[in-house]
Every structure is written in C-alpha cells, then in structure tokens.
C-alpha cells in the first residue's frame, strides 16, 4: 500500500475527518433542498434578484420552462435526501457534482456576487468525492489492483489534521481574496449595489453608464462590458489640451 493510501485510510478512521465529512454532507444537502422546494412550489428562484440582472435573465427564462423547472426542483430534493442518507450519500455526491460545476460556471460567467459560496460548495463536493475514493475508484477507467487490508505503518496523527485544516483555511482565504479582485466591475445583486462600486472606481462615469446599461436598458452583460471598456479606454487615452 502506497503512502498516499495510508494517509487516506488514516483520515477515514479519524473522528475529526469523519465529522468534517458529515458537516459537508449537511451543507451540500442544505444548499439544494430549499432551492429545489422553491422550484417544486412553482415560485421563481431568487425573487430578490432583478430581472435585468444578467443572472436574473437566466432565472426568468428558467422559470418559464414549465415542468422542466419543476423537474429540476425534484432532482435537487432527491439529491439532497440521498446525500443525507449514509448508504446513498456517495450516489448523491456523484449526482451533485455535475450540477454544482454547472452552477459555478454560470455564476462566474454572469459575475454573480455569490460565486464564493458556490465555489466553496464545489470544494466540499470534491472533498466528499475523495472521501469516497474507495468506491469512486471502481468507476474510473483504470484497472484496480487487489489491495490487502490497510496497515498504517507511520501514522501522522495530529499533524494530518493540522495540514488538512491549515490548507483548507489557506484555500478559503485565497478564494475570498481572489474573487474580490477577480473583476474590475460587476453588476452586483441590485442596481444600488452596482452603483456603490462606482464611488471608488477609477472611471466613475463609465461605471455609472455600465449600471444604466444593465438595469435601465436591460442589455446583455457582454454588451455592457464592451461599452464600459470602450468608455474607459477613451478616458485613459484622452489628454486635454490647454
């Protein structure tokens, strides 16, 4: 058995890691159950998000898809329940993974303010996939050699906890800080939130016009970004003559 497998089996037998895996399962289930219930009840998801917001356009269109919208809600509830049940948690995590990847891509593409939370959910899902590697490996297109019962020769003990949780804190810090500086401008979750960023902007006029483009004109995000960049470049290259 390789050293990586030894570390894996040591983590699986550690109560701290077991508790963290349970915590991740609860969080993932909690992220899907209420959102799925909203769809099943026939209500628009994220009602507080304006229709002219880039992600609001998507939610409006999705809401008008009829029974497909209901189907998504039912699927989310089923996934949440499967994740909570120990015997079916692995199946639930497998179903959760492609959905949360799609959600992450969507939120980053529309510059949604909740990208941090969705990224953390994706990381939690990846942890649970690794946690269930003893099952996952049989689904991979690789020949799996027969292994003897795990015998941990040199346990890391508390060092393993420190390395893992220290690394987790570092990753979360990177995500929080990194996403804060990811975009120069974004639509925010409301018109007021969009305009708040203009106070500290290097190009406040271009920023205000961007917010008008999004929330007053209702134009696509790419079109508004192109207009913002054009206005910004004119401001940069303009040199007044005296």
Provide a role label for each language-model segment:
Residues 70-81, 97-98:
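Hydrophobic alpha-helical transmembrane segments
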Residues 1-43, 89-242:
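Extended, low-polarity transmembrane helix blocks
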């Amino acid at each position: 058995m390789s050293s990586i497998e030894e570390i894996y089996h040591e983590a699986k037998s550690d109560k701290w890691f077991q508790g963290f895996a349970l915590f991740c399962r609860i969080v993932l289930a909690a992220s899907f159950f209420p959102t799925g219930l909203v769809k099943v009840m026939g209500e628009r998801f994220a009602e507080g998000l304006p229709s002219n917001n880039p992600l609001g356009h998507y939610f409006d269109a999705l809401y008008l898809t009829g029974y497909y919208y209901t189907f998504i809600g039912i699927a989310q509830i089923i996934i949440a329940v499967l994740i909570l049940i120990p015997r079916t948690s692995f199946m639930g995590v497998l179903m959760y993974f492609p959905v949360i990847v799609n959600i992450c891509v969507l939120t980053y593409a529309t510059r949604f303010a909740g990208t941090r939370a969705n990224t953390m959910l994706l990381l939690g899902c990846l942890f649970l996939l690794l946690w269930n590697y003893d099952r996952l490996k049989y689904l991979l297109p690789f020949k799996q050699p027969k292994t003897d019962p795990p015998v941990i020769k040199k346990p890391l003990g508390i060092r393993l906890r420190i390395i893992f949780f220290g690394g987790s804190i570092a990753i979360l810090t990177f995500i929080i800080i990194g996403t804060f500086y990811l975009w120069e401008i974004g639509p925010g979750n409301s018109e007021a939130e969009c305009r708040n960023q203009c106070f500290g902007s290097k190009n406040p006029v271009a920023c205000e016009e961007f917010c008008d483009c999004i929330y007053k004109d209702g134009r696509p995000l790419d079109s508004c970004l192109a207009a913002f960049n054009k206005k910004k470049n004119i401001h940069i290259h303009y040199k007044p003559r005296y």
